[in-house]
């Protein structure tokens, strides 16, 4: 039997399997990273929606805004998001700066923020 008729040796098979397994591990890492990224994007999306909602509410409210901080909880995406609205006077006393920060459930880190200005009434 000649060398070309014998087929693959055990060593060649082990090397081929090792190369294939490295490729499989790389694909699994990529899938895991995609899942983590999707979860982070979901958090930022809902936090941004809550921040925008509260900021627009502050701009469009008919009554005057109290200077200082207020906080509350808003439901979005089936979860309760904590928001804090800080109202401060701007450089011009007729302008108010409204900063809304939003934290995801079970954490204290800020995931979304909106800053708007409105006329003090």
How should each PLM-predicted stretch be described?
Residues 22-31:
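Short, strongly hydrophobic transmembrane alpha-helices
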């Amino acid at each position: 039997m000649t060398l070309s008729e014998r087929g693959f040796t055990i060593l060649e098979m082990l090397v081929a399997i090792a190369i294939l397994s490295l490729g499989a591990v790389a694909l699994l890492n990529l899938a895991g990273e995609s899942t983590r990224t999707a979860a982070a994007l979901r958090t930022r999306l809902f936090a941004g929606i809550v921040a925008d909602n509260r900021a627009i509410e502050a701009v469009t409210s008919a009554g005057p805004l109290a200077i200082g901080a207020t906080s509350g909880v808003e439901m979005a995406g089936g979860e309760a998001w904590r928001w804090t609205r800080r109202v401060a006077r701007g450089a011009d006393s007729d302008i108010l700066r409204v900063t809304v920060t939003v934290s995801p459930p079970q954490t204290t880190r800020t995931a979304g923020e909106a800053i708007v200005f409105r006329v003090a009434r």
